[in-house]
């Protein structure tokens, strides 16, 4: 069993925020990162991510990051205060392996209960014909994890896909489960029909 980290790896939060940034959904749910004692989760309404953080963290909060994570941040802590407010403290690890706090910023707490994403995350995915996806979601693995390899596995009902990352990426990002919703099967026919109407007009 891995030794737990004293703080949350900032790269995991950056990854969750990268998913949220691909978003045109106004709901608060699609603007927050959910963190509990085991996982970091986020959704933009059409795709979702769950990662193990392996940190000493015993809260269960869904918070909106008002400002982006500083480039030099290596780790972070979520702080809850007596007045109900929440802040994030960023750390960098110095040569003596001490964690040095260097910046703090506000967070916005989601008041509603964060939904249980487990039913979506525990679907069965297998090799097969990949359903049609919104093109920008094909870029998610690169936007979130950088260079690596990925397999796209459809769910049994072909309504979603799992982006199965390579072993190194999986180790670095807490065994990420990244799922995106598929589009309707006849979307290409609709697109062709719209194109024909435009060309005739």
Task: List the model feature ranges, each with a label.
Residues 1-201:
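DNA polymerase processivity clamps
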């Amino acid at each position: 069993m891995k030794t737990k980290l004293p703080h949350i790896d900032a790269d995991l939060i950056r990854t969750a925020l990268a998913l949220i940034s691909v978003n045109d959904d106004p709901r608060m749910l699609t603007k927050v990162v959910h963190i509990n004692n085991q996982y970091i989760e986020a959704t933009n309404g059409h795709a979702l991510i769950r990662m193990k953080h392996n940190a000493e963290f015993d809260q269960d909060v869904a918070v909106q990051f008002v400002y982006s994570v500083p480039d030099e941040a290596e780790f972070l802590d979520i702080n809850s205060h007596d007045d109900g407010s929440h802040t994030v403290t960023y750390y960098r690890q110095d040569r003596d392996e001490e964690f040095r706090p260097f910046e703090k910023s506000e967070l916005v707490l989601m008041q509603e209960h964060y939904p249980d994403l487990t039913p979506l995350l525990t679907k069965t995915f297998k090799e097969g014909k990949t359903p049609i996806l919104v093109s920008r979601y094909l870029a998610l693995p690169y936007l979130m994890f950088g260079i690596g390899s990925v397999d796209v596995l459809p769910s049994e009902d072909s309504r979603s896909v799992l982006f199965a990352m390579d072993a190194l990426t999986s180790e670095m990002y807490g065994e990420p489960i990244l799922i995106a919703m598929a589009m309707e099967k006849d979307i290409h026919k609709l697109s062709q029909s719209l194109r024909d109407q435009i060309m005739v007009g």
